């Protein structure tokens, strides 16, 4: 992909923020137009995150124009909105490789650029890291500034408020920018608010404010009166949220128009030299400047390749995704059981819960980006006699590990975890791979862990987890299902596997959706294939039988080898005194980079060809070809 840079005369001059800072202020609106158009052209040809970046064009330009990056430290939360940042910081020509194997990362990444201060991917980490960076700069007597940009979704997480509370207490110099692209927080945006933001962020006001405080500290009654007067002024002139952030110890400014580049530059210029923790609330529109994305910001959040002229996203007419299989199952259950409750931490669309939320609104809860709360909320529902189902990505369940143990498992409560995006996820890379859930759940007492090999198995396992009366987890991958026939729901026998094919010498013990590769290989190798179904409790009887009747056992899973399902098999063999040779195939001990799912599996030797080579090499090493 190549963009015709003749269409972008100003942007073509910008190879770093230093180039940007050479422009006159009156050139910035044109640069924003070009940057937005370039972003649309690039992402439409490569796929990626679009709507968020379209909404932060003016903010990104203003930040790099006012702050002396990379000396000043700019931290993006999550990173979906950081595509314009990448374009302005020397990676414009590499945008055609974003989210692709060997290409630039979909999120800010420290190893990629000195302008990427913090590697991100998960939400709500920016303020905590930013505070640490600001404290370090303060202790080194560095004059650098620290700026954190966080969205209105990410700031709902408890970790963000923990960091705000700590920052206010430390009174460290830093700026937190709330990029508010929803109508729910505040609609007070206009000329008056922009003007007031300039006043309250200006050096004259801040000097008078700080000087008065030093004097009035000696006269507590007057000091308290003036503090309440200032809070009242901000509450009236700005928004109700100002009081919250002021109480946390921040000087609140806003909301201001996040698409008015002149006002942003003026406000940020004022705020750059303010002391103590500062909070700037800006209002933006997700998808700004591209009508289809403005109309459907959720649909255009992450997009495949598409035609930007028509604005139509390609439809997927292939087999249903595992997320849809889950969503359909949840609706089917809710039709019969008013006590089933669906819970998601801000992943309604991704987890396949749109239809459920519309048809059963009283049984649906989106708790926002609050994974810890989601799990303990489910605990309370289970105690109250309901049947909670927590739909959560594998990578995000990591954020609620203590709640999984302390609140669910210890009390042995019937909470079902529908774990989406388990295994290799593809283009989002290391921060989003579902590589660890089997390992970190398998050691928890009372847990039932199931690994479906196709969509029908997935449905049956969800139903089994829903009926079993214990903490249960069903892990399934990102992407399309196999296309098998769906059968009526029935509870599976807990901890029992199913024998798929009988062979000789080699037995492949499959955990999950790599079963087609195992079956294809079994014909070549005359191998036995067992779909293990359950990681915990594991089918000890089947493992011991296979160890007695075969020379080699091979375990197959899309999870880290360390502590994974193969390790469970090794533990059974060890405790039973079996010396059968065991080959554990799974994800290696490093963070797996971005690539398509197929590319990643091939690179890891977990496609059919790679599995065959690993098995044959293993047998050769045993001296029995």
Swiss-Prot record:
Molecular function GO labels: 1-deoxy-D-xylulose-5-phosphate synthase activity; magnesium ion binding; thiamine pyrophosphate binding
Positions contributing to Mg(2+) binding: 152, 181
Its EC number(s): 2.2.1.7
Entries under InterPro entries matching the protein: Dxylulose-5-P_synthase, THDP-binding, Transketo_C/PFOR_II, Transketolase-like_Pyr-bd, Transketolase_BS, Transketolase_C, Transketolase_CS
Annotated Gene Ontology cellular component terms: cytosol
Gene Ontology biological process: 1-deoxy-D-xylulose 5-phosphate biosynthetic process; isopentenyl diphosphate biosynthetic process, methylerythritol 4-phosphate pathway; terpenoid biosynthetic process; thiamine biosynthetic process
SUPFAM superfamilies: Thiamin diphosphate-binding fold (THDP-binding), TK C-terminal domain-like
Residues that bind thiamine diphosphate: 80, 121-123, 153-154, 181, 290, 371
Assigned keywords, A-Z: Isoprene biosynthesis, Magnesium, Metal-binding, Thiamine biosynthesis, Thiamine pyrophosphate, Transferase
Entry similarity comment: Belongs to the transketolase family. DXPS subfamily.
UniProt subunit comment: Homodimer.
Protein name: 1-deoxy-D-xylulose-5-phosphate synthase
Organism: Haemophilus influenzae (strain PittGG)
